[in-house]
């Protein structure tokens, strides 16, 4: 469906990471495509990007909240604003670390998969590192209380209790 046709966007799903050989990561990340996939709920969109299938996962972007994604080529995380229509803008460099997936906890801390799992507060200050048995690629919070960080690696899937 056309991007502008969807009203009252609840969330958008964007690539968790991008590899851009042409060093056009910033422009591609805030580009607004003409079309999007619309979920059955009628308010969740997936903007149609030519490199959508290249990403290791999709991350949820909620209007009014910051969205983080990884620039694989330059190995850094960027932060963007999410508008009411689900589009991204105001890209800024957040931390000089990042390879694949990331996840944000209830307090706004950012967990970044980059060989290990690095933890940053909402201002970009490094809070720590979580060693894992295998190079992480995708991160997602879940569990009964939302305090388990689920991690995928090349051959393993495991959970790390955060609190």
Identify the role of each PLM range.
Residues 30-32, 74, 88:
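A detector of repeated loop/turn-to-beta-strand junctions in beta-rich toroidal repeat architectures
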Residues 5-8, 74-76, 156-158:
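Short glycine/acidic-enriched loop and turn motifs that connect beta-strands
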Residues 150-163:
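Short, basic/aromatic-enriched C-terminal tail that caps enzymatic domains
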Residues 1-5, 13-22, 29-35, 47-66, ...:
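Beta-rich, blade/repeat-based domains predominating
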Residues 33-36, 76-78, 116-118, 156:
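A short loop-to-beta-strand structural motif that recurs across blades of beta-propeller domains
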Residues 80-87, 161-163:
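Short loop/turn segments immediately following beta-strands, especially the blade-tip
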Residues 39-46, 84-90, 125-128:
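Beta-strand initiation motifs
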């Amino acid at each position: 469906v056309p991007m502008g046709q969807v009203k009252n966007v609840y969330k958008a799903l964007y690539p968790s990471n991008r590899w851009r050989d042409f060093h056009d990561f910033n422009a591609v990340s805030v580009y607004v495509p003409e079309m999007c996939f619309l979920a059955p709920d009628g308010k969740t969109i997936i903007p149609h990007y030519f490199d959508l299938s290249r990403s290791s996962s999709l991350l949820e972007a909620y209007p009014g909240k910051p969205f983080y994604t990884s620039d694989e080529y330059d190995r850094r995380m960027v932060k963007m604003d999410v508008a009411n229509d689900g589009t991204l803008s105001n890209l800024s460099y957040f931390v000089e670390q990042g390879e694949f997936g990331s996840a944000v906890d209830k307090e706004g801390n950012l967990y970044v998969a980059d060989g290990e799992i690095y933890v940053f507060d909402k201002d970009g200050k490094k809070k720590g590192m979580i060693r894992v048995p295998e190079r992480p690629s995708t991160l997602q919070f879940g569990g009964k209380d939302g305090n388990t960080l689920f991690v995928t690696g090349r051959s393993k899937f495991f959970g790390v209790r955060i609190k």
